[in-house]
Amino acid sequence: MSNLFIPRSTKRAVYDGPLPMVGSSLPPIEINSKGDKSVVYLRGDDQPIDVNREHRMVKVTYNEYDEQETIKVIFLDKKATIKDLHNLMSVGRDLTTGVCNIEVQPEYGFTLRIPDPDKLKYKSDIDAVYRLFASKYDNSDLFERASESLAFQITLDMNRERKDPKVLGITGDARGWETAPDLIGDYMDVVTNNYMSRYMKGV
């Protein structure tokens, strides 16, 4: 099992549904497959990060879930890999002292749900949550912050070699860092990538 690697084309052809899901015996993660029998349980290191993806986003929202307050961490990348999901599970363990639920959402990616916000470690320090996600990747140079209605999200640039952030431009040239207005848009704008963005220096 530890040497198993499923190419993306094979995954889609065989399972025709959600990406494979990581199983974990380590608390506090609980895996919720929503009854989808196509979910396959693999170790997180069975598949490497897909470096061909230019961007992937993480959005955190505070809302109600089944009439109870909850926090959702939404990983917006339809082509996210097993390693990405493993990273999200790791974030869940670091974010809360309670239980996290991870769900596969084939229309946009993965969702990490924290049903007990009172046990969230960083609820008063959003920058700490940014750093927590960025620490899971080696070249997380680009960030985006959403409007209040979307809480916040992160963009991780996975398709560029590590360069000096003082001289790296958004397209990889020596233009330095760009700053634009805060992201504007609703949930569907984010899912369909039709939005304005602001790029900030990564941590």
From Swiss-Prot:
Protein name (database record): Uncharacterized protein ORF43
Organism: Ostreid herpesvirus 1 (isolate France)
